Amino acid sequence: MTVTLKDFYADWCGPCKTQDPILDELEDDWEDRFRVEKVNVDEEQDVANEYQVRSLPTLVVENDDGIVERFVGVTQREDIEDALEQAGA
């Protein structure tokens, strides 16, 4: 099963910069168990609209069956890990 973490961000978003190191650590520690797709909402407004992103940062964990979890605002590593496990990573 493919597990994806979509990271909706903007270059001007301070909290997004706070979230980045957490996601980088997760990627390193979890290796190939999931993939991260970074979505710059200023450049990819259609994707942001499709996922109804209204605040930043927004993280969406999904698998082949659809969206498993959505987080708005800076999210703790443990919460993201729980969602990744629930999604099958």
Predicted regions and their residues:
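Non-catalytic, surface beta->alpha helical segment in thiol-disulfide oxidoreductase systems
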Residues: 60-89
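Short pre-active-site segment immediately N-terminal to redox-active cysteine/selenocysteine motifs
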Residues: 9-12, 55
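The canonical Cys-X-X-Cys-His
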Residues: 13-16, 59
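Structural micro-motif
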Residues: 52-60
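Hydrophobic/aromatic anchor residues within beta-strands of the central parallel beta-sheet
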Residues: 34-36
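Structural microenvironment flanking redox-active thiols in thiol-disulfide oxidoreductases
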Residues: 41-47
